[in-house]
Structure formats: structure tokens, C-alpha cells
Amino acid sequence: SRGLGDVYKRQAFIPSKAKFMIRDCKMVAEKNKINFKFNSYFPIKSLNLMRGVFVAAEDGIKDLYIDKIFNAVWVDGLNMNDEIVVEKVLKNIDINPKTFVLRAQSQNIKNQLRSKTNDAYKKGIFGAPTFIVKDKIFWGQDRLQYAIAEAIK
């Protein structure tokens, strides 16, 4: 079984790639009229935020949670490494931060994330966004049209 740390250790930080990705994200956002700001606090320690997706799913607010966390990081540029900032974001969507965080740290939630991570690893998924259509992997936002074409074949 592989943990998230194992996956991340394999992906070396390459400064030239990081610089390119920042520029590319800004270009794609501008072209598609998406409100986006590269977060100056990046990289964000996202483990607890990812666990939160499973808690939010149990509460029936997964999509809302994902949208608000995404906006906090990539639109508002908030420091989501700071627990106080995370608490404020959670409160703004009527989530009790204390209870939510406790649930996110439960063994059940940890196991769910670990299971999904292992499933992704076994399928050959290595980054986001990844689309799987008819057992074929399409990686990157620039491959969405290829994935759609494959789906309607």
C-alpha cells in the first residue's frame, strides 16, 4: 500500500517546470476567462484538505466544499497552511471547523483517502487533472477534448 508521501517523493521538484506551470496556469485561466491567481503560499499542505473531501461527501456537501477550498487557494490566494484561515473558510460555508477537523483525522477518513490514492496509483494516475475514458488515461486540461472525443466514439 502506498501513501500520498510515497507518491509525492517520486515527483521531483524542478524549478523550470514550476515556472512553466505558473505561466501556463495563468495563460489557460486568462484564455478561458477563469478567475485565477497563483497562490504565493504554494505549495499548500493539502493532506487535511483532501481528507475533508470525504467528510464533506458524508455530509452531502462535497461539491460545495471542493469549490470553496479551490477558490480559497486559487482565487483568493489564502494561506491554507494556516489553521485559522482554514477555520474561517469552513465557517463561511456553515461547517463547524472543530468537529470537521476531528472527523477528517479519523481512521475511517484516512483509510478512504489512502484507498482512493492506491486505486489511482494502480491505474497509473500521476497528476491532475486526469480523465479515464474506456480504460485510457488522458492527463492535463489540454486533453479534455481528446477524452470527450474518446467517450463519444
Question: How would you name each of these model-derived features?
Answer:
Residues 1-8:
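Short, small-residue-biased leader/transition segments that mark boundaries at the very start
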